[in-house]
Design a protein with these regions (language model features):
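Short beta-edge strand/loop motif at the mouth of beta-sheet-based domains
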Residues: 4-5, 11, 15, 21-56, ...
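Hydrophobic/aromatic beta-strand elements that line small-molecule binding cavities or substrate pockets
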Residues: 7, 56-61, 80-87
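A generic beta-sheet turn/junction motif
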Residues: 9-11, 50-52, 63, 74-76, ...
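Non-transmembrane alpha-helical segments in soluble domains
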Residues: 17, 120-123, 127
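Signature tryptophan residues that serve as conserved aromatic anchors
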Residues: 29-30, 72, 119
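Short, solvent-exposed secondary-structure boundary/capping segments
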Residues: 66-73, 92
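Beta-strand/loop substructures that line and gate deep hydrophobic ligand-binding cavities in soluble
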Residues: 75-121, 137-139
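Short, highly charged C-terminal tails/helix-capping segments
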Residues: 128-144
Length: 144
C-alpha cells in the first residue's frame, strides 16, 4: 500500500530540492540535523535533538531538482520514500510517496494515518520555512 502526500510550495524547484539534500537546511523544518549532504548511495544519519532520537536512511536515488528516493531501515525492510518535485509556474509541487506498509498488519490504517500526519506536518514546516522564513514550526507537534 502507498501513502501519498502532496503540497504546493511557492518557491523554485531548485530551492526546494536543496532544502532536502543540504544538511544546513534540514534543521530549519524537519530534523535537528543531518550527518551529511544527501547523495545517491550514502547512508545518512538524521537526528531529533528534542526527542533524543536518531535514525539512518539509505539514499537510493537522487535526480537533481526532480527526485529523492530513500529507505528507512534496512535495505530489505522498512519503508521506501520517494520525494518528487514538480515545477509549476512560480511554485513547486512536492509529492511524497511512502511504500512498504504491511497489508496484513492489524494496525495498518493507524500506521498509514500516523505517517500521513507526519508527512503533512513536515511539508507544512517546509512551506513555512521556505515561503516565510519561519523555522519555529519544526518539532512543535504534540501527540497524545
Amino acid at each position: 500500500m502507498k501513502n501519498v502526500t502532496k503540497m504546493k510550495i511557492f518557491r523554485p524547484v531548485n530551492v526546494v530540492f536543496e532544502a532536502f539534500v543540504d544538511p544546513s537546511e534540514i534543521g530549519n523544518y524537519w530534523f535537528s540535523s543531518s550527518s551529511e549532504r544527501w547523495e545517491q548511495g550514502k547512508t545518512v544519519t538524521l537526528r531529533y535533538e528534542e526527542y533524543d532520537a536518531q535514525g539512518e536512511i539509505n539514499i537510493i536515488e537522487i535526480k537533481d531538482n526532480k527526485k529523492v528516493v530513500f529507505r528507512w531501515g534496512s535495505n530489505e525492510e522498512g519503508h521506501l520514500v520517494t520525494i518528487s518535485l514538480h515545477a509549476l509556474d512560480n511554485a513547486t509541487i512536492v509529492e511524497v510517496v511512502e511504500e512498504g506498509f504491511n497489508d496484513n498488519d492489524d494496525n495498518l490504517i493507524r500506521n498509514i494515518v500516523d505517517n500521513k500526519e507526519g508527512w503533512v506536518y513536515m511539508l507544512t514546516c517546509l512551506k513555512g520555512y521556505l515561503e516565510s522564513g519561519n523555522n519555529t514550526l519544526r518539532a512543535a507537534l504534540v501527540k497524545g
